[in-house]
Amino acid sequence: MSRYTGPSWKQSRRLGLSLTGTGKELARRNYVPGQHGPNNRSKLSEYGLQLAEKQKLRFSYGLGEKQFRNLVVQATKIKEGTLGFNFMVLLERRLDNVVYRLGLATTRRQARQFVNHGHILVDGKRVDIPSYRVDPGQVISVREKSMKVPAILEAVEATLGRPAFVSFDAEKLKGSLTRLPERDEINPEINEALVVEFYNKML
């Protein structure tokens, strides 16, 4: 299954979750898109619940199915902690996500574009791989030639708050993942146990 590239507002309404983080998609129409949307919230089976939760998390981070499943497999190899939480931490450590958490982009999709276009440095070296895994303490910054890119400056100005597990210098446009996040600091609306149950049959 390829990465979804259609309108985020439509997918947000289908999943019942704001993919942009603004909540605007659900403010006026908090039901699935389509002619019968307002009356189409039918009760889901156990599998349906697992699938819906998996899709919410996958679309939130903007990953293709193969990438998403591979991260689950990688999480199974971590000996400490629960599989679900370890999986969530691996998602958070992706470079595109850290760029988003720092406020250098307004959405993860935009953050991925900034990384792909070579605007982002890790410890002073350009990294254009969105899935690059960031370690605590590594410095994420904007390339000097990109420091006046309007979209980046607008994102920084629009960011009202940042998670406690990152630090950021708005003047220098650089920051870092200071530590790994705690479970209650990331995606409280997601039940990762359902996601793990969905993949248990495949692992």
From Swiss-Prot:
Signal sequence region: none
SMART domains (UniProt xref): Ribosomal_S4, S4
GO cellular component, one term: small ribosomal subunit
InterPro entries cross-referenced by the UniProt entry: Ribosomal_uS4, Ribosomal_uS4_bac-type, Ribosomal_uS4_CS, Ribosomal_uS4_N, S4_RNA-bd, S4_RNA-bd_sf
Ranges of residues in domain S4 RNA-binding: 93-156
Listed CDD domains: S4
GO molecular function annotations of the record: rRNA binding; structural constituent of ribosome
Keyword check for Ribonucleoprotein: yes
Quaternary organization: Part of the 30S ribosomal subunit. Contacts protein S5. The interaction surface between S4 and S5 is involved in control of translational fidelity.
Superkingdom of the source species: Bacteria
GO BP, sorted A to Z: ribosomal small subunit biogenesis; translation
Function: One of the primary rRNA binding proteins, it binds directly to 16S rRNA where it nucleates assembly of the body of the 30S subunit. With S5 and S12 plays an important role in translational accuracy.
Record carries keyword Cell membrane: no
Keywords per UniProt: Ribonucleoprotein, Ribosomal protein, RNA-binding, rRNA-binding
Family assignment from sequence similarity: Belongs to the universal ribosomal protein uS4 family.
Name by which UniProt lists this protein: Small ribosomal subunit protein uS4
Any one Pfam family match given in the protein's UniProt record, by short name: Ribosomal_S4
